[in-house]
Amino acid sequence: MILYHGSNKEIDRIDLSKSRPYKDFGWGFYTTPYKEQALAMAQRTVRLFKSGIPAVTVFFLDDGVLNDPSLRIRKFDRPNTEWVNFVVNNRNMRPQDTNNPECNIDNKYDIVIGPAVDDDIVLQLRLFLRGLISIPDLKKTLKYKELTSQISFHTEAAVCFLTKAEVTHG
């Protein structure tokens, strides 16, 4: 499987300590199977930090890794209540709902796979957190949204399966 990582610089070696907090699936290294999504992230990162040039680093991941029983893998096939709670909990770095306190703050998962949150979805999540819309309303909004996908790596045990293939600049 080919995965892409968009940044404001080429990634020579994955260093999880350089990851930023408050991400969808917790502190980790994020990739996507979509080159266009990675390029958009690279361009956004350059604008945000006002430094570097858009770079998409290409990685190879053996498909069998996602079935490796020694890895703790969490997969969300679509946005649902579990996914919303998981993303909200990770973005706030504390469980928000005592009935569903699941998150990946402690890197209990080596790899997490699921829909990516964009700026429109962030707005909807904020409305939900403020109590202005309900989970069913949030899910209804997401139903008509074209979602992208991400695969995040949260531990050295997971990162070691990624092999750098190339870098493109855009």
Show the residue positions of the predicted features.
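Short aromatic-glycine-(Arg/Gly/Cys) micro-motifs in beta-strand/loop hairpins
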Residues: 1-23
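Short, conserved beta-strand segments within well-ordered enzyme catalytic domains
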Residues: 3-5, 30-31, 58-60
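Short, flexible loop/turn elements at secondary-structure junctions
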Residues: 8, 31, 35, 63-65
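A short linear-motif detector with a strong N-terminal bias
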Residues: 8-11, 35-40, 130-132
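Extended catalytic/binding region for NAD+/ADP-ribose chemistry, centered on the ART fold
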Residues: 20-44
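Conserved NAD+-utilizing ADP-ribose enzyme module
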Residues: 23-24, 44-49, 53-170
